[in-house]
């Protein structure tokens, strides 16, 4: 039998009656192997400084047991019953925690209360710099911060955890509690602890009434990651969980960026000897990720208080661990090391308290208007190099493939050179750059990359960043169940399959999405889909294996915006029919898999294929379309740059009436106007991306609508000027301008026509103006 990593024989001070435990589990734990499945094996985890934790194994089944320590304990500490109940609530809500199986309050079984949970197989990283993994994965792992944001977004009532905490005043109680517990455990006087406690008590944040479910000890070595992927499987150690201010968790999770250089050891390894690098997100980037996920501003007042509180708390924990060591009741072998940590931790807390504020966005001294992360700069440079070395040279071969197969079924397949480029990009880590959870890039970072890929229409697919797959992957990432992610998101992320999105319908005015007629009706353990869709981009690709379909679910009592749902439909499901490809200004657009009319006739899929729940379709659509519209716009700006380049080359090569075209003032003015249009469009798009990063999708709705109107108009103007300078050649197959124009023109209709976005802009503008007026509009 393989030994569980990180375990040892049960330490003498934590031994208990294993026979009694085995008999109890045989009686009370469903599924626990009965005799004669072999003896129960018990080993103790070497990590963990609080509640002793044990690995149980019998008959091929593995469990984890957490118990109270023996002997005298600090007041109100080691509440394993609270750990069990909060994990049970979170597991039921789909949050990544080990499944809690059983709680035992009968101290006669093993001498203390305990609970048992399912063992989760995965990786735990004890060193925050993650030396065990490669650079690309290392940065993605830090997006465990998304998991923290998810935790803080839960409604306590929906979890059934009303009364779990003690109500408003969390920060005040924390200062008081940790001061009291430190005083009870102190073995010597440390002036810095007293001074820090006094400062915290006198500088409580004004919003101390904010309440969310918080973990209390959220850090990377309390997280189990997937064995091979950068994915969180379980968050551990809920002993300190309660309801309180979420920024306390955020500060605690990011405190290692400020860790005292004199402290290289915390139990095991150089856990906090860490600074941000190109591969590791900076403190500012982690804060930005968290704020983006929660939809809050990245300007965080009082962050110095929460960081100082984190160090005060760490000092108190360290003192408590050492106190248990002195009485022979420590949970870990390295507990004696903690005595020397209290003073440096307190001093660091005092240092942080003197910082007036922390901003998640660093002030840029390079002259750039928008902040681009270090990793964003690095990836953008790599993408530019890849485009120059591999993508541009492949353009001719790809064009020849589609010209050769334009009237055959081969046109729906991908050119071999494109598949080779995809493998090369994937090998270089230039893959799935659009998804923050994978790339660690902000929307602003990706906006600049999307512009670069937009310079060639086939380039986004090289990096697995093509629509509609990007939007579908975002939907599954944000709203899909673990089962849905495993079956569909993972192969999409790997580039093994493609997808289509079915929303627009031929028989209704789709600019008002509530007109939708496609029905999704519950029938036992299935949903039945009936309806017609068109402009389903990518459906002609032979590799298109799944569609996300939006339709109406029967709920007459709900508002008109809560009657629609999104559901996953495998393309090989009986009743799914591809009717015809739709042309765009005469182009079939084979390179993007075409734009198909698709009919769904009595299509039956399992209930588990519903995304997020009935009536949540518009909610999902808004989450999907916000960033997606920005991605389209930035790619369009890349196309505009290509068109302007063609314009200038033509103007420099051709002569009329005895002089170069660019010497004609009208052409020179066109060139200038095109540059103005591109720069204006880019600035608005980057502002919108930055606002999504800092305030979230909802707060950026006005800017998203403005960008969606402005950019296609500006780009069409540039392409039209380029066509005019090129003359007849500009509308021929010898130049990409005609197909560019056709594609960009569709963006004034796709993802909502200009008129819908203009109405949105006007509505938000009136609301903004009304705040400035005394009379209500």
From Swiss-Prot:
Catalysed reactions listed for this entry: a 2,3-saturated acyl-CoA + oxidized [electron-transfer flavoprotein] + H(+) = a (2E)-enoyl-CoA + reduced [electron-transfer flavoprotein]; docosanoyl-CoA + oxidized [electron-transfer flavoprotein] + H(+) = (2E)-docosenoyl-CoA + reduced [electron-transfer flavoprotein]; tetracosanoyl-CoA + oxidized [electron-transfer flavoprotein] + H(+) = (2E)-tetracosenoyl-CoA + reduced [electron-transfer flavoprotein]; eicosanoyl-CoA + oxidized [electron-transfer flavoprotein] + H(+) = (2E)-eicosenoyl-CoA + reduced [electron-transfer flavoprotein]
Task: Kindly list the GO molecular function terms attached to this UniProt entry.
Answer: acyl-CoA dehydrogenase activity; flavin adenine dinucleotide binding
Report the sequence similarity comment from the record: Belongs to the acyl-CoA dehydrogenase family.
Q: Which Gene3D superfamilies match?
A: 3.90.1200.10, Acyl-CoA dehydrogenase/oxidase, N-terminal domain (1.10.540.10), Butyryl-CoA Dehydrogenase, subunit A, domain 2 (2.40.110.10), Butyryl-CoA Dehydrogenase, subunit A, domain 3 (1.20.140.10), Phosphorylase Kinase, domain 1 (3.30.200.20)
In the UniProt record, the gene name given for this protein reads: ACAD11
Any single GO CC term annotated in Swiss-Prot or TrEMBL for this entry: cytoplasm
| Subunit organization | Homodimer.
GO BP terms: namely: fatty acid beta-oxidation using acyl-CoA dehydrogenase
**Top enzyme class:** oxidoreductase
Involved pathway(s): Lipid metabolism; fatty acid beta-oxidation
One protein family per Pfam: Acyl-CoA_dh_1
Its function, per the record, reads:
Acyl-CoA dehydrogenase, that exhibits maximal activity towards saturated C22-CoA. Probably participates in beta-oxydation and energy production but could also play a role in the metabolism of specific fatty acids to control fatty acids composition of cellular lipids in brain.
What cofactor is needed? FAD
- EC no. given is 1.3.8.-
Please report the name of this protein according to its UniProt entry. Acyl-CoA dehydrogenase family member 11
Cell compartment(s), UniProt: Peroxisome; Mitochondrion membrane
Main localization of the protein described in the UniProt heading: other
**Residues bound to substrate:** 511, 626-629, 752
- What InterPro entries does this protein map onto? ACAD10_11_N, Acyl-CoA_dehydrogenase, Acyl-CoA_Oxase/DH_mid-dom, Acyl-CoA_Oxase/DH_mid-dom_sf, AcylCo_DH-like_C, AcylCo_DH/oxidase_C, AcylCoA_DH/ox_N, AcylCoA_DH/ox_N_sf
Q: Kindly list the positions annotated as binding FAD.
A: 501-511, 535-537, 654, 724-728, 753-755
């Amino acid at each position: 039998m393989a030994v569980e990593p990180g375990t040892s024989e049960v330490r003498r001070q934590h031994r208990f009656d294993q026979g009694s435990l085995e008999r109890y589990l045989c009686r009370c734990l469903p599924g626990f192997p009965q005799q004669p499945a072999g003896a129960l094996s018990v080993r103790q985890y070497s990590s963990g400084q609080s509640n002793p934790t044990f690995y149980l194994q019998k008959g091929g089944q593995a469990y984890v047991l957490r118990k109270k320590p023996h002997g005298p304990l600090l007041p109100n500490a080691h509440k394993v019953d609270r750990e069990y109940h909060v994990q049970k609530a979170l597991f039921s809500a789909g949050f990544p925690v080990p499944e809690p199986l059983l709680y035992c309050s009968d101290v006669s079984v093993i001498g203390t209360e305990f609970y048992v949970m399912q063992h989760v197989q995965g990786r735990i990283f004890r060193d925050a710099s993650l030396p065990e993994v490669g650079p690309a994965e290392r940065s993605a792992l830090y997006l465990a911060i998304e998991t923290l944001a998810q935790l803080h977004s839960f409604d306590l009532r929906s979890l059934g955890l009303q009364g779990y905490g003690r109500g408003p005043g969390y920060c005040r109680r924390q200062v008081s509690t940790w001061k009291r517990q430190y005083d009870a455990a102190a073995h010597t006087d440390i002036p810095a602890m007293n001074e820090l406690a006094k400062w915290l008590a006198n500088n409580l944040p004004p919003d101390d009434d904010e309440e969310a479910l918080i973990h209390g000890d959220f850090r990377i070595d309390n997280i189990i990651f997937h064995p091979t992927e950068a994915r969180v499987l379980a968050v551990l150690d809920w002993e300190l969980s309660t309801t309180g201010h979420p920024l306390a968790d955020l500060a605690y999770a990011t405190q290692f960026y400020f860790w005292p250089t004199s402290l290289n050891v915390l139990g095991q390894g150089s856990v906090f000897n860490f600074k941000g690098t190109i591969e590791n997100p900076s403190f500012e980037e982690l804060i930005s990720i968290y704020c983006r996920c929660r939809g809050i501003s990245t300007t965080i007042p009082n962050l110095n208080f929460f960081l100082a509180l984190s160090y005060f708390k760490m000092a108190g924990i360290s003192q408590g661990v050492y106190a248990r060591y002195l009485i022979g009741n420590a949970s870990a072998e390295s507990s004696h090391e903690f005595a020397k940590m209290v003073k440096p931790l307190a001093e660091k807390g005092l240092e942080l308290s003197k910082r007036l504020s922390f901003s998640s966005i660093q002030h840029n001294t390079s002259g750039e208007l928008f902040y681009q992360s270090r990793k964003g700069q690095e990836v953008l440079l790599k993408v530019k190099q890849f485009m120059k070395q591999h993508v541009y040279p492949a353009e001719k071969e790809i064009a020849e493939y589609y010209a050769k197969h334009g009237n055959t079924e081969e046109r729906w397949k991908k050119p071999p050179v494109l598949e080779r480029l995809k493998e090369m990009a994937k090998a270089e880590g230039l893959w799935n750059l659009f998804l923050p959870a994978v790339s660690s890039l902000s929307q602003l970072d990706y906006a600049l990359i999307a512009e670069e890929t937009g310079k060639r229409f086939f380039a986004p697919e090289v990096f697995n960043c093509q629509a509609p797959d990007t939007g579908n992957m975002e939907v599954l990432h944000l709203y899909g169940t673990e089962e849905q992610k495993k079956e569909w998101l993972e192969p999409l992320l790997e580039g093994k399959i493609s997808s289509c999105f079915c929303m627009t319908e031929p028989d209704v005015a789709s600019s008002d999405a509530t007109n939708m007629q496609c029905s999704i009706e519950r029938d036992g353990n299935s949903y039945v889909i009936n309806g017609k869709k068109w402009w389903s981009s990518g459906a002609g690709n032979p590799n298109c294996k799944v569609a996300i379909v939006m339709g109406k679910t029967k709920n007459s009592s709900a508002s008109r915006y809560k009657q629609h749902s999104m559901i996953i439909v495998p393309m090989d499901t009986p009743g799914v029919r591809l009717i015809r490809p739709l042309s765009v200004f005469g182009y079939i657009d084979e390179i993007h898999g075409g734009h198909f009319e698709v009919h769904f006739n009595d299509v039956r899929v399992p209930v588990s294929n519903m995304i997020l729940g009935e009536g949540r379709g518009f909610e999902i659509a808004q989450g999907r379309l916000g960033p997606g519209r920005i991605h389209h716009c930035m790619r369009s700006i890349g196309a505009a740059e290509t068109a302007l380049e063609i314009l200038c080359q033509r103007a420099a090569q051709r002569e009329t009436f005895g002089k170069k075209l660019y010497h004609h003032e009208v052409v020179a003015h066109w060139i200038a106007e095109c540059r103005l249009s591109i720069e204006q469009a880019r600035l608005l798009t980057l502002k919108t991306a930055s606002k999504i990063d800092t305030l979230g999708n909802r707060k950026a709705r006005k800017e998203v609508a403005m960008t969606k109107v402005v950019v296609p108009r500006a780009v069409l103007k540039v392409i039209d000027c380029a066509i005019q300078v090129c003359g007849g050649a500009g509308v021929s197959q010898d130049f990409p301008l005609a197909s560019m124009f056709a594609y960009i023109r569709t963006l004034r209709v796709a993802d909502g026509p200009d008129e819908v976005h203009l109405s949105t802009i006007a509505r938000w503008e009136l609301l903004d103006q009304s705040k400035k007026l005394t009379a209500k509009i």
